[in-house]
A protein has these predicted regions:
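Hydrophobic alpha-helical segments
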Residues: 1-168
Length: 168
């Protein structure tokens, strides 16, 4: 309700970020209480960790870029603080892509069944980080003008995030 009452886009973004963190904590509690995080099978523990801790980092980072990019496109310019934050976000995406690839290999490599069922979705999810980085650079950071429709940008990043949600 607080998010709906807030009028500032940046304040809404911060509130949504807090809500996402609480949702991630809830999923970790559920996994812990159900015993998934302590299961005797290592592959189940790794998949549980992937879903509750790793993939939320992917969607959260893409979501931050989505919010900042849509905001900047809506304003028609990229202010200095947003430019700095985008530079940090692009570095974070690059680092996350390497870490995420390794964690996907670990989680799917532990089980032939998991690998067979999830390999394609995992590859698509991993690729979404590079695609997101390219999208942020092309349409916001390096764009000559910020006159592209913010809704198209927002929807494009949402589709990238959906690739990780499908893996979950």
């Amino acid at each position: 309700k607080a998010q709906q009452q807030e009028t500032s886009l940046l304040s809404k973004s911060a509130l949504i970020g807090k809500l996402l963190n609480k949702a991630q904590m809830l999923s970790q509690i559920i996994a812990s209480q159900s015993g998934l995080s302590r299961d005797s099978q290592g592959d189940l523990r790794q998949l549980s960790e992937l879903i509750t801790s790793v993939t939320p980092q992917v969607t959260q980072t893409l979501g931050e870029g989505r919010a900042m990019g849509a905001y900047s496109l809506g304003q028609g310019f990229l202010n200095s603080s947003s430019s700095t934050r985008f530079d940090e976000l692009l570095q974070q995406l690059e680092k996350l892509q390497a870490e995420y690839g390794l964690k996907l290999q670990d989680a799917l490599g532990a089980s032939k069944a998991a690998h067979a069922a999830l390999d394609s979705l995992a590859s698509t999810s991993n690729a979404s980080l590079k695609q997101g980085s390219e999208l942020f650079e092309e349409q916001v950071v390096m764009a000559e003008t910020l006159d592209a429709p913010w809704q198209d940008f927002y929807d494009g990043v949402s589709r990238l995030m959906a690739q990780t949600y499908q893996l979950d």
